[in-house]
Amino acid sequence: MKILVTGATGKLGSKVVESLLKSNPASNLVVSVRNPEKAEELRNRGVEVRQGDFDRPETLDHAFKGIDRLLIISADGDNETRIQQHANAVQAAKRTGVKFIAYTSIANATESKNLMAPPHVATEAAIIKTGIPYSFLRNNWYLENEIGSIQGAIAGAPWVTSAGEGKVGWALQQDYADAAAAVLVGDGHENTVYELSGPLLTQDELATALGNVLGKDIPLQQVSDEQYAEIMKSLGLPDFVIPIVVGIQESIRNGSLEVESNDFEKVLGRPVTPINEALNQLVNLIS
């Protein structure tokens, strides 16, 4: 059985590959990357490295050839670009006879008002249309997304948010990677939708948990979206990023990530890493 992971040199993709290598021979594993030179270390460990670029569909036919089980990791970029890139990958999977597609989606994708949901809605629909058995891994929110705020808190800054009492199912990328690996090698995942959500917490509860890890109080600063935009600008975020980060706060406030589910533990076969332990890992990583 040949398994392929796209975006295998990215933050999530590299963790999925490492998770797979713990229990699977390297000879069963193929990675598809835009720049094969970046995957030289994997090649040296016996993993087959192929070039695959979501912007160049002709490269994907070669990349996906002979693959049984495929993980499409959602790309970065604006919504329109991502929709086209993902469509290219899905069509190539169909052309090359891939037998199973796992795809990293977003929480509650089909009903989500999250500004990042449209590419996931389009991609899930495109995969279903192929008739290929699938599993949608609806990843809630990476704890790593909060590293900037964690660094600020370590340096003495307050935890700034305009997300109000909106709840998030934060978890470590490693947990999401382990879940993806489990679906790629496990049985019974055909035509499934998994809501991969950690225990739901508000921003205040996350800041309190971080304070427990750091051994100090972290003041919470609830602001308006307009104030949040100004603060982000003052921290040096580029102008084009500001509406995105504000939109994320707004969608959290409106409950787009408030998805309660035990799918994560079911897929992992273990509990999600507890939030204090997860925060401790990130704090150690930063310092």
Identify the function of each model-found stretch.
Residues 43-55:
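Rossmann-fold cofactor-recognition segment
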Residues 4, 50, 268:
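Conserved Rossmann-like nucleotide-binding pocket used by diverse enzymes
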Residues 11, 226-287:
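A hydrophobic C-terminal alpha-helical subdomain
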Residues 64-69, 283-287:
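Compositionally biased, low-complexity linear motifs
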Residues 2-28, 33-38, 55-58, 62-65, ...:
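Oxidoreductase cofactor-interface core, primarily capturing Rossmann-like NAD(P)-dependent enzymes
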Residues 6, 73, 104, 269:
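Residues lining the SAM
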